[in-house]
Structure formats: structure tokens, C-alpha cells
From Swiss-Prot:
Gene3D superfamilies: Glycoside hydrolase/deacetylase (3.20.20.370). One of its GO terms (biological process) is carbohydrate metabolic process. Keywords: ATP-binding, Hydrolase, Nucleotide-binding. This is 5-oxoprolinase subunit A. Its EC number is 3.5.2.9. The lineage of its organism: Bacteria, Pseudomonadati, Pseudomonadota, Alphaproteobacteria, Hyphomicrobiales. Catalyzes the cleavage of 5-oxoproline to form L-glutamate coupled to the hydrolysis of ATP to ADP and inorganic phosphate. The gene is pxpA. Forms a complex composed of PxpA, PxpB and PxpC.
Length: 254
């Protein structure tokens, strides 16, 4: 059995840094790099790509709504399909150019924050993201929340998919993530999270906040770099998986 560990990195801005990218880069096998709209800038993007190349880690674009102040975690009411396509294509292209400068290659795309959350439940948003990815490069792997409208849009567009589960987030009974506004939405206990991820990988399922077992294909597990104790959590998850005979490797080539 093989599984990927992915992490959202490069989410600082200017002199401000978010999380310990250098440490996470030694644990993750794929990283999703902010492309300047919700976080990141050209220098941070370039430094993050170089760090990924040095560590043999696959890189992907992490496009979000243009909302630095809100870290891309606030929906944009009234945004059109064309506007979503444009902002996704723009951000993928930006990372592709920076990656070329650093001698690395973008292999996948994963939507960030509110853009992803809305797309998991809204057909128009999901289709617009998938359409933009396909137009830019149909070989890019689309990282999607398992069992979501993002997944259905990716399938309809004929894109290669990586089905994602979240190590440090709680799930509702319908398979969507519990809103960060609710208590208990983000998990922090490293041992609990490691055991949870092992069950996800072995059983192909997640357990909701009410105890409901939801079958989900698991190609990649996300550990958020901005979660408190992220490095310890990620290290514990990888150690638990490898100790159980599961190969931790990227879903796309580096």
C-alpha cells in the first residue's frame, strides 16, 4: 500500500512567515504552494519551490480567492464562473513560471480555503476550477476532497485525480469538513491523529463527529502546516504509517 502526505506551504508574505516550511518539507511527499492571492509572493514561491526540489518533494499550485487579509478563508459572494476560471488559471501559471525558474515542475493543483470549501458543495465553482486546470494543462493531477462535487467535476473533465482526506480536521456526516468556526473542527493530539490516519489508509474510510463511518478513497492525506504542532503531528503520522508497512510517497512524479 502507498499513500502520499501533502501539506500547504509557502503561505507567508514578505517578511512574515506561516509555519515551519523547512521542517514540514522533510516529512511531506507533496506540497501545495500558495500563489500570491491568499498568501505567498514571488520570492516566497521561489524559495519554497527550491526547498521542495532539494528534498525531492512534488509541488502543486494552491490557488485561492484574492483575499490576503482573510487568508482566503472567506467566500466571495457573486463571483462568476469566468472569474473563478481566470483566478485559478492565473495562479497555476504563476507557479509554473516560478517553478521553471527554479528548475522544478508543477505536478498538481489543490484549491485553498473558501474556494475549496465552496466548490465541494457548489457545482458551478467545482466545474470552473476543473475547467481552468484542464485548459492550462490536462495532465495536472487535481487534488479533491473524496466524495465531493470537486471530485465529480474532476471526473467529468477527465482530469487525473488524487482523492484527499484530512488528518487534522473533523468530518460532518455528509463527508464535508466541519467548519473552522465550530469547536472541535481542528484536531491537535498527535497520537490520536496518527491512529486516525492509519485507519483512514487501511480502511478507506473516515469517521464523522457523530461516529458515522464514511467510505472514502484515500490517495493523499493533508496535514495543515498552520495547525498548532504541525511538525510533530506530521512526523507522528509518517512514523505510524511506515511502521505499519505503508509506503509514503508522492502520488505524482517529482
Amino acid at each position: 500500500m502507498k499513500i502520499d502526505l501533502n501539506c500547504d506551504l509557502g503561505e507567508g508574505f514578505g517578511v512574515w512567515q506561516m509555519g515551519d516550511d523547512a521542517a514540514m518539507m522533510q516529512i511531506a511527499t507533496s506540497v501545495n504552494i500558495a500563489c500570491g492571492f491568499h498568501a505567498g509572493d514571488p520570492d516566497i514561491m521561489h524559495a519554497t519551490v527550491k526547498l521542495a526540489k532539494q528534498n525531492g518533494v512534488a509541488i502543486g499550485a494552491h490557488p485561492g480567492f484574492r483575499d490576503l487579509h482573510g487568508f482566503g478563508r472567506r467566500p466571495v459572494p457573486g463571483i462568476t464562473s469566468a472569474e473563478i476560471e481566470n483566478l485559478v488559471a492565473y495562479q497555476i501559471g504563476a507557479l509554473q513560471a516560478v517553478a521553471a525558474l527554479a528548475g522544478h515542475k508543477v505536478t498538481h493543483v489543490k484549491a485553498h480555503g473558501a474556494l475549496s470549501n465552496v466548490a465541494c458543495e457548489d457545482d458551478m465553482t467545482a466545474r470552473a476550477i476543473a475547467s481552468a486546470i484542464k485548459a492550462v494543462d490536462p495532465s495536472l493531477v487535481f487534488v479533491v476532497l473524496a466524495n465531493s462535487k470537486l471530485m465529480l467535476a474532476g471526473e467529468a473533465a477527465g482530469l487525473p485525480l488524487a482523492h484527499e482526506v484530512f488528518a487534522d480536521r473533523a468530518y460532518e456526516d455528509d463527508g464535508n469538513l466541519v467548519s473552522r468556526k465550530k469547536p472541535g473542527a481542528v484536531l491537535h493530539d498527535p497520537n490520536e491523529i496518527a491512529e486516525r490516519v492509519l485507519r483512514m489508509a487501511q480502511d478507506g474510510a473516515v469517521v464523522s463527529v457523530t461516529g458515522k463511518v464514511i467510505k472514502m478513497r484515500t490517495d493523499t492525506v493533508c496535514i495543515h502546516g498552520d495547525t498548532k504542532g504541525a511538525v510533530e503531528i506530521a512526523r507522528g503520522v509518517r512514523r505510524k504509517l511506515e511502521a505499519s508497512g505503508i509506503t509514503v510517497a508522492p502520488f505524482a512524479g517529482t
